[in-house]
């Protein structure tokens, strides 16, 4: 009964975690009620650190936020249907810049498949990004970022890649790679409420 109440009756409450608000992980805030009053205040939440803690990630590398810009063009793609026969492409290359509209932060580490057994590890890559609201551009930038920063598969055999927001990363998996993609929002919710995801 309590789980039902939390999942449905409090949906959209500013004092509970809003999974739909992960578009900009750097600006996430919770509205907190002061005990014994009707007064509320906003508190910034570090979603990156909170997520690492929730999934039990042993962090091996925590990158800084990096900004990127790019120009776009459309090219005809005969594999697409007639009504949408163009595909969005980069016009040039991905450019790293401090004030870039697209921002990424990667975290590398591992979780323990069996609690306490440090020999039974699941190697994880967590990709946080600031979304602009344009799904096609956001996903193209993620794809290009992933291609640019992918290391040799032998060096980076991740078991799981977590990423916030809708994405098409599974389409980039190469034949020798076996990683799976999980949405941060789903994994966050599952870890918080201990429910099957």
Each language-model region and where it sits:
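Accessory, often C-terminal, charged low-complexity segments
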Residues: 1-197
């Amino acid at each position: 009964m309590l789980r039902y109440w939390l999942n449905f009756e409090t949906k959209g409450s500013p004092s509970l975690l809003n999974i739909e608000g992960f578009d900009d992980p750097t600006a996430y805030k919770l509205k907190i009620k002061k005990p014994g009053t009707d007064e509320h205040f906003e508190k910034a939440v570090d979603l990156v650190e909170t997520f690492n803690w929730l999934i039990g990630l042993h962090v091996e590398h925590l990158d800084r936020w990096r900004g990127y810009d790019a120009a776009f063009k459309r090219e005809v793609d005969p594999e697409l249907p007639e009504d949408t026969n163009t595909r969005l492409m980069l016009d040039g290359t991905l450019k790293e810049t401090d004030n870039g509209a697209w921002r990424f932060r990667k975290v590398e580490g591992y979780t323990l498949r069996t609690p306490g057994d440090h020999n039974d590890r699941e190697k994880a890559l967590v990709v946080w990004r600031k979304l602009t609201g344009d799904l096609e551009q956001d996903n193209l930038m993620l794809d290009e970022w992933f291609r640019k920063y992918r290391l040799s598969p032998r060096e980076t055999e991740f078991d799981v890649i977590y990423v916030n927001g809708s994405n098409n990363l599974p389409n980039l998996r190469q034949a020798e790679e076996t990683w799976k993609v999980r949405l941060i929002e789903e994994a966050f919710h599952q870890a918080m409420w201990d429910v099957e995801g």
